[in-house]
Amino acid sequence: MIKERSQKAIEILTKNDRGGYTVPTSKLYPHQWNWDSAFSALGISTYNKIRAWQELIILIRAQWKNGMIPHIIFHENNPNYFPGPNHWQIKSNANTSCHSQPPVLASIIWDMVNNGNNYDLQKGKSLFNSLMAYHEWFFSARDPNNKGFISIIHPWESGRDNCPDWDLGLHNVNAVSYTHLTLPTICSV
């Protein structure tokens, strides 16, 4: 049973591979996501180390100058996905969102290095400064009172964005001024 599930996981990761990065699902989420890429790399590392590190390197290439690694990297502009790269209106080295996600990336890399060989150690070392910048960004941008508590500023940053945890707080948002969108991406799922 475990072997069958492992094979199924490999099939899904392979199907969602876009040549250097993985999408969570091909229709609903057609871009690279921070958390998803980290966890995908961990899975991919069990059968293809080179491809696993490529996933993380491509993710980190989208890192902002201030250290943030965005939660979405738009390698392509899919007109059926909202909010797409034009929505964010940012000036960065890549088309990205303006949110991040909690930094599980360091834990994933730690695991890949600890369970790997010298190749993994060298790759981990090559990403160390980027990881430090990412964590420093969290402590400077998301802990403004220096209390040691990192906060998030939007449900999408939690990695639990479609969870009922947010219903109470979002219930207070006046949605009258917002436009209802029916997106082809959502309708096709």
Q: Where would I find each of the regions flagged by the language model?
A:
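Short N-terminal secondary-structure initiator segments
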Residues: 10-36, 40, 122-141, 145, ...
